[in-house]
A protein has these predicted regions:
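His/Asp/Glu-rich mid-to-C-terminal helical/loop segments that flank catalytic regions of hydrolases
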Residues: 159-194
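General beta-strand structural signal in soluble alpha/beta enzymes
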Residues: 2, 31-35, 51, 101-107, ...
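Generic non-transmembrane alpha-helical segments
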Residues: 85, 89-99, 182-193
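Active-site/ligand-binding-proximal alpha/beta "capping" segment
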Residues: 92-129, 194
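Zn-dependent metallopeptidase/amidohydrolase metal-coordination segment
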Residues: 133-171
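Metabolite-binding pocket within alpha/beta catalytic cores that recognizes anionic/polar moieties
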Residues: 1-78
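Alpha-helix C-terminal capping segments
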Residues: 22-30, 43, 124-126, 140-148
Length: 194
C-alpha cells in the first residue's frame, strides 16, 4: 500500500485503520510500516533509519474505541507491538549490507503542526526517541488482529536539543527520499527471508 489516511487530515480512527482491517480480511500475517519522524535522541542524525521497538500512543482518539471487532480481544496485549524476531532479522540484514540503523521508541501524535521545542523535550523525557503523526493507530489495529508488525522510521528532522531547529514539509520529504533506498533494501530482503 502506498500512502495512508492521516488523523490530522480529518479522518476518524475507523477510516485511518480501515486498510489494516481489509488487509486482515485478505489474510496478511505480517505488516511492514514506515514513516518520517522527528528525532529526539541525541545520537540520531537526519537521514538515520530507526527500527521501532515500541511506541507511545498520544493520539486523542483510540482506534479500538467502541464496539469490539471480532478479530481480537476487547483488551489486546501490546507488550510486543513490534515483533522482536522481525527486529532481529532487520538488524542482521542491515549488518550484512552495511546499513547503519538505530533503535528506539516512536511516539504517535495528532499533528498537523511540527513539534515545539518544549514538546520535543517533553516527549523525550516521556521515553520517546522519535515522534510522528502516523503509524501507532495502524499498529494497534494490526496487533488486535494478530498481525505481526515491523516498523521503521526515517529521521527527517531533529528537535529537543539546546538549539531549536526549524523544519519544513519539503525538508522532511527530501530527507525521507534520500533514506528510502536503504529502507527499501532492508524491507525487501526481510520479505524474501520471511
Amino acid at each position: 500500500m502506498k500512502g495512508r489516511f492521516h488523523f490530522y487530515e480529518g479522518y476518524n480512527m475507523k477510516d485511518v485503520t480501515f486498510p489494516i482491517r481489509v488487509m486482515h480480511e485478505l489474510g496478511i500475517e505480517t505488516l511492514f510500516v514506515s514513516n518520517a519522524s522527528g528525532g529526539m535522541n541525541p545520537s540520531f542524525k537526519i537521514g538515520d533509519l530507526m527500527i521501532i521497538t515500541d511506541h507511545i500512543n498520544m493520539f486523542p482518539e483510540h482506534p479500538l474505541r467502541g464496539r469490539n471487532f471480532p478479530t481480537g480481544p476487547r483488551f489486546p496485549d501490546m507488550h510486543e507491538a513490534y515483533d522482536h524476531k522481525l527486529v532481529d532479522l532487520a538488524d542482521s540484514i542491515a549488518k550484512e549490507k552495511n546499513i547503519e540503523v538505530q533503535h528506539g521508541v516512536y511516539m504517535g501524535v495528532q499533528g498537523p503542526t511540527f513539534e515545539t521545542p518544549a514538546e520535543y523535550r517533553m516527549y523525550h523525557k516521556l521515553g520517546a526517541d522519535a515522534v510522528g503523526m502516523s503509524t501507532v493507530p495502524e499498529v494497534i489495529v494490526a496487533r488486535h488482529s494478530d498481525i505481526k508488525v515491523f516498523g521503521i522510521s526515517v529521521i527527517t528532522d531533529l528537535g529537543g536539543f539546546d538549539v531549536p531547529v526549524k523544519v519544513s514539509h519539503e525538508e522532511v520529504q527530501e530527507a525521507a527520499n534520500a533514506a528510502q533506498p536503504r529502507m527499501t533494501e532492508i524491507m525487501r530482503e526481510m520479505i524474501k527471508r520471511s
